[in-house]
Amino acid sequence: MRTLLALVLCAPTLAPALAFAEDITLENLVRAETDHMIRANIEAFGLEVGQIVHQRETVDLANQPVIRMNVDTIYSSLVLDLSEPVEITLPEIDGRYQSMHVINQEHYMFVEATPGTYRLTEEEVGTRFAAVTFRTFIDPSDPDDVKAAHVAQDGINVSGGGSGPFEAPDWDTGQLAVARKALNDLAAEISFDSARAFGRKGEVDPVHFLVGGIAGWAGLPAHGAIYLIDAVDQNDGKTPYAVTAKDVPVDAFWSVTIYNADGYMEPNDLGRNNYNNVTAEPNDDGSITIHMGGCDDGRVNCIPVTPGWSYAVRLYQPRKEILDGSWTFPEIKPVN
């Protein structure tokens, strides 16, 4: 913790503010990033306040509005104006993973993954506007599963709420970009604890909240998912790595996704940036080995890497042994 705090405090001074733009400070940095990301989603997905938009395919690598997105789920996006209450219903979908992730403008959040109707108010959520992301599991390689995932998306119902428009300060995007780069570099070097970074106000640690709010924006709270975001020692894009996992204690699923030096998925000839325990080919003993780099020889479950790459392990709906630290994900090691 002492090292992390020192590095944050010694980060480069933010760039000079643009005329008429709202200055970025350590106190408002996460708020500014959240407002920026909400605007980015509005533009990227053509959102209108109060209107849900379904993405029918996994994220387009040419249009990644947020760093470290996943390709295990398809997204449905919604921006709420909570000047009036909203009701959201999650459908019964035969056990398929689907979650509703509510993020206020301060990046405090909560998640629900149980079918039912939820009433949201400005008082409960904490800010007038909120971003809501629905994640629905999909296996893109299975046409029947794709159809079922789309039906699950269509079952989400939203009613009530104000009509906007979305309002936020005109934050200095130049300063924000400098701060984002510094904290992304920090997270890649020494990581942060997602269990202490994401949650309601009062549930998070201020340092991990600051780093996670930039390097892992829109990450799920611990009971929804645990994120292991890090970089290996030799992430030169040439040294291959691998990890083997078996009997991972989650109630939903787990995955490994690879990102470039800027935190985005990099297009590659294999068209592969991720594997999860459904899409990966298992070993004879039921374990799963995922390779990172060295894909030219056709090794199984291989994800290409680039210089400066990092990874995110996602553990969806982790069980007690993950949350209390008695079980840890296996180490990612170099491959000879």
Predicted regions located by residue number:
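Gram-negative bacterial Sec-dependent N-terminal signal peptides
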Residues: M1-A21
